[in-house]
Amino acid sequence: MTTGKIIQVIGAVVDVEFPQNIVPKVYNALEVTNGKNKLILEVEQQLGSGIVRCIAMGVSEGLRRGLTVIDLGHAIKVPVGKSTLSRIMNVLGEPIDMKGIINAEEHWSIHRSAPRYEELALSQEILETGIKVIDLMCPLVKGGKAGLFGGAGVGKTVNMMELIRNIAIEHAGYSVFTGVGERTREGNDFYHEMKDSNVLDKVSLVYGQMNEPPGNRFRVALTGLTIAEKFRDEGHDVLLFIDNIYRYTLAGAEVSALLGRMPSAVGYQPTLSEEMGLLQERITSTKYGSITSIQAVYVPADDLTDPAPATTFSHLDATIVLSRQIASLGIYPAIDPLESTSRQLDPLVVGQKHYDVALGVQGILQRYQELKDIIAILGIDELSEDDKMVVSRARKIQRFLSQPFFVAEVFTGSQGKYVSLQETISGFEDIINGKYDHLPEQKFYMIGSINEAMTKE
């Protein structure tokens, strides 16, 4: 093994000098022992004269010039396979759940190529989530990618936890949850939620939390993806959840600044599109198995044109947009049915009936949106009878789009509801056709299927 020595330490950036004829490759893992602690560095740049610039995959506290560094001769490798299920790991694949070591038969490099074109496989099979607004307005497809876009505090993590809970119980495959730069408290809550739902034995958890150095947060998404790729290549249908893809971008911006690159628009790294592409192109389905990915995307200052969410948009099949305005009305999940889109909302994929009902719902809500200004100025009494009916049905639809969640039971006191796709379509179809025009709109708030509106107090 080649050895070198540290010549400079600036925060998370460490420069290491090696003999000029055996300089480590970019992305190689280096190991430095500091007392009892071992720290992994990842080579990011070769500066010439045998010097490489590295990012520390951990706290660089205590490092000093002159310490010996060993080149491991390969990129960071993490355990993969069934031994990772029900375990919590860090960016290096080390267990952080105090349940002992992970006895994996294989370790894979976190830097891998995307599958070749001839290996790819497309699926048109709809993935039922049990959440009405998603299943109707922005359906997800098996092997597709969906993004949950929203500002701070509108419910991205709660929606993601509900999706994991519903799909993991209904769907027999494995799930990988990757916490990228999120709160430790949320990671802890998520673990206990999965344990209480009895789905922990089908989930691998990989965390790189908010308090960790930028190198950990930047690479942890690749660690989770590598574990998911192994399950896919074994022939499984895998669910990959990433919370939050914005923190991945932010960690990349921190690393870029530390490496001395010139920032681009709004202070992001100049390599933003490339880094996003490297991650997203690997999240795909092959003829062996599928990876279905659901990613939470924080939207800074609720601005969807910010480079970070805007770069993510182009990689997704479905965009689920969470709205602060809808959350302020007390309608949860606060998903905007007019802003949210899906490539699968096509009669050839979802069927003509589903497509017609979704378009009917969109049409009524869009008309209600247009009438709001008139109502605010002149009052609802000045509207024509047809428009009054549109407003009445739109308000019922708006309330029927709300739904009690299983993962929020402890906060709301309402039992969670799973609504099948067929029940969702027939419920909205009945509202559009005027079957429930005689019922007050309050009856449609926070219920599961449409039948509950008849019995609700």
UniProtKB/Swiss-Prot annotation:
EC class (word): translocase
Enzyme Commission no: 7.1.2.2
Location within or outside the cell: Cell membrane
Membrane topology note: Peripheral membrane protein
SMART domains xrefs: AAA
SUPFAM superfamilies assigned: C-terminal domain of alpha and beta subunits of F1 ATP synthase, N-terminal domain of alpha and beta subunits of F1 ATP synthase, P-loop containing nucleoside triphosphate hydrolases
Major subcellular location class: membrane
Binding-site list for ATP: G150, G151, A152, G153, V154, G155, K156, T157
PROSITE patterns linked: ATPASE_ALPHA_BETA
Protein keywords: ATP synthesis, ATP-binding, Cell membrane, CF(1), Hydrogen ion transport, Ion transport, Membrane, Nucleotide-binding, Translocase, Transport
Keyword Ion transport: yes
GO cellular component, one term: proton-transporting ATP synthase complex
Signal sequence annotation: none
One GO molecular-function entry: proton-transporting ATP synthase activity, rotational mechanism
Domain of life: Bacteria
Classification via Pfam families: ATP-synt_ab, ATP-synt_ab_N, ATP-synt_VA_C
Function: Produces ATP from ADP in the presence of a proton gradient across the membrane. The catalytic sites are hosted primarily by the beta subunits.
NCBIfam families: atpD
Subunit (UniProt): F-type ATPases have 2 components, CF(1) - the catalytic core - and CF(0) - the membrane proton channel. CF(1) has five subunits: alpha(3), beta(3), gamma(1), delta(1), epsilon(1). CF(0) has three main subunits: a(1), b(2) and c(9-12). The alpha and beta chains form an alternating ring which encloses part of the gamma chain. CF(1) is attached to CF(0) by a central stalk formed by the gamma and epsilon chains, while a peripheral stalk is formed by the delta and b chains.
Record-stated family: Belongs to the ATPase alpha/beta chains family.
Official protein name in the record: ATP synthase subunit beta
